[in-house]
């Protein structure tokens, strides 16, 4: 009879422990019920990228001295630099510069080690293309600055925080940007 009593006590302790775990899980669920949704509707909503976001590389042709430091520090030797030595002034003259973003791993080494700061990272991340050869950007394509998400007049920017609630009952006629 004594083992039966200890069996009931163990059963009771396990029941109390299970109820406590269920209660803790329910409290976590309730704490998340008040938050805004994390998912964004991509074509109409865009997240504002951080200041240190590593997007497409911007290249300034006039600043480049064709030193090829970017090629040497790139883990995959990606930037293609064509130059010619000007014998009368004993300097290199840049002829062509290109980066294939289909291969680029966006490590940022080329931007970090460039001595003249002719390379910089932009906030552009929409680089998809139907043909992989379209991802090979020359110096003209690299020189274009992308339109900032904040400056885009077709997108309405909103901040995602617990203090500011997005009104779900208002119809959205513009695209929305969410800041994380």
From Swiss-Prot:
**Domain 4Fe-4S ferredoxin-type: residue ranges:** 55-84, 95-124
NCBIfam families per the record? ndhI, NuoI, PRK05888.1-3
Q: What is its main location?
A: plastid
- Family assignment from sequence similarity: Belongs to the complex I 23 kDa subunit family.
Q: Which taxonomic lineage does the organism of this UniProt entry have?
A: Eukaryota, Viridiplantae, Streptophyta, Embryophyta, Tracheophyta
What processes does the entry annotate via GO biological process terms?
A: photosynthesis, light reaction
How is the protein disposed in the membrane? Peripheral membrane protein
This protein's cofactor list reads: [4Fe-4S] cluster
Q: Which residues bind [4Fe-4S] cluster 1?
A: 64, 67, 70, 114
Q: Which domain of life is it from?
A: Eukaryota
> What enzyme category does the UniProt record give?
translocase
Keyword rRNA processing present in the record's keywords: the answer is: no
The primary gene name is: ndhI
What does the record note about the cofactor?
Answer: Binds 2 [4Fe-4S] clusters per subunit.
Record's function text: NDH shuttles electrons from NAD(P)H:plastoquinone, via FMN and iron-sulfur (Fe-S) centers, to quinones in the photosynthetic chain and possibly in a chloroplast respiratory chain. The immediate electron acceptor for the enzyme in this species is believed to be plastoquinone. Couples the redox reaction to proton translocation, and thus conserves the redox energy in a proton gradient.
* GO annotation, cellular component aspect: chloroplast thylakoid membrane
Report the protein name in the record: NAD(P)H-quinone oxidoreductase subunit I, chloroplastic
Q: Where does [4Fe-4S] cluster 2 bind?
A: 74, 104, 107, 110
- Taken from the record, one Pfam family name reads Fer4
């Amino acid at each position: 009879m004594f083992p039966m009593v200890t069996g009931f006590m163990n059963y009771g302790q396990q029941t109390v422990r299970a109820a406590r775990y269920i209660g803790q899980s329910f409290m976590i669920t309730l704490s998340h019920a008040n938050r805004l949704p994390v998912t964004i509707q991509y074509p109409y909503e865009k997240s504002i990228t951080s200041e240190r976001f590593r997007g497409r590389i911007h290249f300034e042709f006039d600043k480049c001295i064709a030193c090829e430091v970017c090629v040497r520090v790139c883990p995959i030797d990606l930037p293609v630099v064509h130059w010619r030595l000007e014998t009368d002034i004993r300097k290199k003259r840049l002829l062509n510069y290109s980066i294939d973003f289909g291969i680029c791993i966006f490590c940022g080494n080329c931007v970090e080690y460039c001595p003249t700061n002719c390379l910089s990272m932009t906030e552009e991340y929409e680089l998809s293309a139907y043909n992989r050869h379209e991802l090979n950007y020359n110096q003209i394509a690299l020189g274009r600055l992308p339109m900032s998400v904040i400056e885009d007049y077709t997108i309405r920017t909103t901040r995602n925080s617990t203090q500011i609630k997005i009104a779900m009952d208002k119809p959205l006629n513009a695209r929305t940007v969410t800041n994380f």
